[in-house]
UniProtKB/Swiss-Prot annotation:
PANTHER family: DIMETHYLADENOSINE TRANSFERASE, DIMETHYLADENOSINE TRANSFERASE-RELATED. The keyword rRNA processing applies. SMART domains: rADc (SM00650). This is Ribosomal RNA small subunit methyltransferase A. GO terms for molecular function: 16S rRNA (adenine(1518)-N(6)/adenine(1519)-N(6))-dimethyltransferase activity; RNA binding. GO terms for cellular component: cytosol. InterPro entries: KsgA/Erm, rRNA_Ade_diMease-like_C, rRNA_Ade_Mease_Trfase_CS, rRNA_Ade_methylase_Trfase_N, rRNA_adenine_dimethylase, SAM-dependent_MTases_sf. Keywords: Cytoplasm, Methyltransferase, RNA-binding, rRNA processing, S-adenosyl-L-methionine, Transferase. It is an enzyme of class 2 (transferase). Specifically dimethylates two adjacent adenosines (A1518 and A1519) in the loop of a conserved hairpin near the 3'-end of 16S rRNA in the 30S particle. May play a critical role in biogenesis of 30S subunits. It comes from Francisella tularensis subsp. holarctica (strain LVS). Gene3D superfamilies: Ribosomal RNA adenine dimethylase-like, domain 2 (1.10.8.100), Vaccinia Virus protein VP39 (3.40.50.150).
Length: 262
């Protein structure tokens, strides 16, 4: 592996360089030869090499043009990925679907500074993917997989758990990266749910979740006061107890609340 390129702090770059960890990630992602794989932010190709050995159809989406020559050089012995030098947030995943409409496996060591926007884009594309395996800051993964009645349970937990089965499958220490980040990392697995509770208005559901967690220490009654007043709704008629805080509600509770208020 060549490490000639200097990591750019502005892009949140930390290059993975531990071969054992890389092999473990690919193993956990269960990638087969026929899979269509898209790697987000391949950097210098440490993970890409193993993806090329596992699948016949690997695409990479890399925003930083300065790493692409090194990426190609590092992958030379393993194959050639389809390279898209662009921002993943503007990338059209459906352009990769083949004639049989085969769904895509997403994987990547996500830049920590834009991990949330990427996750929300993946939500929009959830009908096009088989699963996703992302390396993220461990604290973020813990928030995503948190259950109700915990301090780390929040907006991200509710929104992602509505769409996916979410699990933390591997913890990763800082020393396997170059340069070393100041935080621990973890692998998040997202698997789209086969069936979801029906929502009357998804955008309104997102808004209700956002408002409910706006001030964590306040009750639902206080956080949703303006919405209830606007709709002239008596809090006692709601399907949830508004004396509770948002962190006490399950994903299903938020669905019921949003549908009632829609």
């Amino acid at each position: 592996m060549q490490y000639k390129t200097k990591a750019k702090k502005s892009l949140g770059q930390n290059f993975l360089q531990d071969e054992n960890i890389i092999r473990k990630i690919v193993q956990l992602a269960n990638i087969k030869k026929h899979d269509i794989v898209v790697e987000i932010g391949p950097g210098l190709g440490a993970l890409t090499r193993y993806l090329l050995s596992s699948s016949n159809n690997v695409s990479v989406v890399e925003f930083d043009a300065s790493v692409i020559d090194t990426l190609i050089a590092n992958c030379q012995k393993y194959g050639t990925p389809h390279i898209y030098n662009q921002d993943f947030l503007k990338f059209d995943i459906s352009s990769l679907e083949n004639s049989s409409n085969q769904k895509i496996k997403l994987i990547g060591n996500l830049p920590y500074n834009i991990s949330s926007p990427i996750l929300f884009k993946v939500i929009k594309d959830s009908d096009k993917i088989v699963d996703a395996h992302f390396m993220l800051q461990k604290e973020v993964v813990e928030r995503i997989v948190s259950l109700p009645n915990s301090k780390s349970y929040g907006r991200l937990s509710v929104i992602l758990q509505y769409h996916f089965d979410c699990s933390m499958i591997l913890k990763i220490p800082p020393e396997v990266f170059y340069p070393q980040p100041k935080v621990d990392s973890a692998i998040l697995r997202l698997k789209p749910k086969n069936s979801k509770e029906l929502l009357k208005n998804y955008n309104f559901f997102e808004e209700i979740v956002k408002q409910s967690f706006a001030q964590r220490r306040k009750t639902l009654h206080n956080n949703l006061k303006s919405i209830l007043k606007e709709r002239k709704i008596d809090p006692s008629t709601l399907p949830v107890d508004t004396n509770l805080r948002a962190e006490n509600l399950s994903v299903g509770d938020f669905v019921s609340l949003a549908n009632f208020l829609s």
